[in-house]
């Protein structure tokens, strides 16, 4: 463990002290690498309901993408037992940026969580529901003809958005799993039988929410002059109410030349598919109702997907020097964190929405890892809205998990 460190920016002489400060502690340690994953699902909370256990992966190497079928160890960090690392399972569907799409089941967040896995023999992807009390997989969501896996759990539970990770591994490796079976038609840039699916976690039933063919048609209607590039999905995000989904339709990431990078929204019943001309940069995050947090120009903005207008701003460009960073809103909606890179470090700005007070953290070493093996800032809140899990390199050069804790000075 490292010592606790104050992490506030300097306060000018004569100025009032910040109403809160930040403390940093190292959660995991050792010769192995430990990490959680990224913020590709909204309200992604690494802690279970009681706050005792934190989910993580343990791996041997961080300087390369995993080999096809290479396993990562799934671990629990017991915060009541000196952060003991407890191995419980393995997954063969993971990568260094996103992990394995961990998400505690909102309907049983004390003991159950989702993760992605692949069949060792067939390479087909699927999602697992695991119970830490029973120490067993209590359900696997398999679709053998057209395998897909979790790409975003509904924040209130009951469903997850499912994606074809084989297609993503082909079209943008950093978001896929190497060697996963790809069932989509390589010669069809926008197949009608692939896209975003919704899986009912209770029944296991699956339906196609929106197809790539529908997205391609919408792009043409909106007069996006792009070549017929194969489309894929990134950042499939349920809103807090569970009635809207925001996502990016993309293409051309594995080649030189023009790209497609267009935001869409759709109601969770499959209606109101909307192609947005206002691009929200970075990793978007849902605020209240129909509001999405992202970047427009130098500003951290609130964009209303229903009115298709910018509805407000958070802070200023001085507070958020890179509004296109990784962003996350606390579970109660009162706190916001923006993680951004400078050189070989990740920094975090913690912002209180009620009064605009903010504090910037010290830098977390991310090394020179880049591209598919980069260490993104990826901040993730706890359930009590006073701590954030972040990645970084420890003194021995291993990738570890750190906690930024908010301390009141009032």
Model regions: which residues?
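Loop/turn-rich, solvent-exposed surfaces of beta-rich toroidal or solenoidal domains
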Residues: 299, 317-357
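Asp-box/WD-like beta-propeller blade repeats and closely related beta-sheet repeat scaffolds
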Residues: 91-106, 115-195, 209-225
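Beta-strand-rich domains and repeat architectures in extracellular enzymes and scaffolds
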Residues: 26-72, 236
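Blade-loop segments of beta-propeller domains
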Residues: 39-43, 61, 67-119, 125, ...
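Short, conserved, GDST-rich strand-edge loop motifs in beta-rich repeat architectures
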Residues: 57-71, 115-119, 162-193, 248-260, ...
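Conserved blade-ending motifs and adjacent loop-strand segments that build the rim/top face
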Residues: 277-282, 315-327, 357-380
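Surface-exposed loop and turn segments in beta-propeller and other repeat-based domains
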Residues: 25-37, 87-96, 144-145, 206-228, ...
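Blade-terminus and WD-like Trp-Asp/Gly-His loop motifs, strongest in beta-propeller folds
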Residues: 44-54, 94-120, 149-159, 163-164, ...
